[in-house]
Curated annotation (Swiss-Prot):
The gene is hemC. This is Porphobilinogen deaminase. Belongs to the HMBS family. Monomer. The lineage of its organism: Bacteria, Pseudomonadati, Pseudomonadota, Gammaproteobacteria, Enterobacterales. It comes from Hamiltonella defensa subsp. Acyrthosiphon pisum (strain 5AT). NCBIfam families: hemC (TIGR00212).
């Protein structure tokens, strides 16, 4: 392989390809002599869109094929939505750059209602996320949440043909695909706390590939990296995955990190939440300590119950 080439592994969905082109454009801007070649791939997660993620092994199904391509030296980097990435990496790989984060919030979309609070009892809301389901049931107990899979276009089509009264999607994905006009309402974190890593693009690479590591470092956005490190540290301590409703959202306020998080039951009947602040050097410590607090206040029992199901 030429030293002036990077092979980029990506999923084939429109959003994944947008993210891949974003990274390609950035790398070629900072390194004018570099040529980035996209290697679109179909992952296991793309092949089982009819089944809820919580029942199929989680979002790691969307990254394993890409990781294998990097490990086998068929690709040099893999580009992911960080919220889809597992907490632990295969030996030899790592999350080496976090691009500047897009809006991490959730969006409410409906053809009939202008505000999520207007939903009447019995309204059907679509989402594939247990985190969103938990918070929707907590705040609006009269609604019915049903699973919603597929890429963004497929989900919008299901809304348009009347399968759902409303759906909830990530703001970042809609903005990246030029679909801001479909958003009815952006949900405040107090109503729908985002998932760890939501809205952020991550670059995975072989840790011994020093040349590529130096190149992709130019795309790393330090403030976004700090927030993501904080959010994912909490998830690691909780050992939380797609089968568990967990929100983990860090912001920078007054020159310090502010992490808010919750662990909940899927039906929204029980939610343990909390927050913690600290300096930038303590990003992972903040997440770890808040996780311990949540565990001591009842999250451990929720997680144990979910693991038995």
């Amino acid at each position: 392989m030429s030293n002036n080439m990077i092979r980029l592994a990506t999923r084939q969905s429109p959003l994944a390809l947008w993210q891949a082109h974003y990274v390609k454009t950035g790398l070629e801007f900072f390194h004018p002599d570099l040529k980035v070649i996209l290697l679109p791939m179909v992952t296991q997660g793309d092949n089982i869109l009819g089944t809820a993620l919580s029942k199929t092994g989680g979002k790691g199904l969307f990254v394993k094929e890409l990781e294998r391509a990097v490990l086998d030296n068929r690709a040099d980097i893999a580009v992911h939505s960080i919220k889809d990435m597992p907490l632990y990496f295969p030996e030899g790989l790592g999350l080496v750059a976090v691009c500047e984060r897009e809006d991490p919030r959730d969006a409410f979309l409906s053809l009939r209602y202008h505000d999520v609070a207007q939903l009447p009892e019995g309204s059907v809301v679509g989402t594939s996320s247990l985190r969103r389901q938990c918070q929707l049931y907590k705040n609006y107990p009269g609604i019915v949440v049903r699973d919603l899979r597929g890429n963004v276009g497929a989900r919008l089509k299901k809304l348009d043909q009347g399968d759902y009264d409303a759906i909830v999607l990530a703001v970042a994905g809609l903005k990246r695909l030029g679909l801001e006009n479909r958003m009815t309402q952006i949900l405040r974190p107090e109503t729908s706390l985002p998932a760890a890593g939501q809205g952020a693009i991550g670059i995975e690479c072989r840790l011994d590939d020093t040349v590529t590591l130096q190149r992709v470092a130019t795309l790393n956005h330090r403030p976004s990296q700090l927030k993501i490190s904080c959010e994912r540290a909490l998830l690691k301590r909780l050992e939380g995955g797609c089968q568990t409703p967990i929100g983990s959202y860090a912001e920078i306020e007054n020159d310090e990190l502010w992490l808010r998080a919750f662990v909940g039951a899927p039906d929204g009947q029980l939610i343990i939440d909390g927050e913690r602040r600290g300096n930038f050097d303590s990003a992972e410590k903040i997440g770890f300590e808040l996780a311990n607090e949540l565990l001591s206040r009842g999250a451990e029992a929720i997680l144990a119950q979910l693991n038995r199901q």
